[in-house]
């Protein structure tokens, strides 16, 4: 993976963790950050999806699209989006 791709994924995943701040526990957010620090981008995205699906957490469409774009880029779309299919849509308001 080249530097630009690495930096892009790091920034996008950290942004996703920030967007999900109210839906994640502090331990979950910390664990996701540790996975990103270790360049385990696919696992970080899968774990975020799993944590959200455990409680069927409502997810805004824009956040769901972020998951879809990232998982498509990383090649784990079926795994990530399958977990998120349990989560209802939340309003962005």
Task: Tell where the protein language model's regions lie, with residue ranges.
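C-terminal-biased regions
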Residues: 1-93
């Amino acid at each position: 993976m080249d530097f630009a791709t690495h930096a892009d994924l790091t920034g996008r995943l950290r942004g996703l963790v920030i967007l999900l701040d109210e839906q994640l526990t502090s331990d979950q957010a910390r664990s996701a950050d540790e996975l990103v620090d270790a360049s385990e981008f696919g696992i970080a995205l899968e774990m975020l999806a799993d944590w959200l699906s455990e409680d069927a957490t409502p997810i805004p469409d824009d956040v769901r699209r972020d998951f879809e774009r990232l998982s498509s880029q990383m090649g784990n779309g079926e795994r990530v989006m399958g977990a998120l299919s349990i989560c209802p849509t939340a309003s962005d308001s």
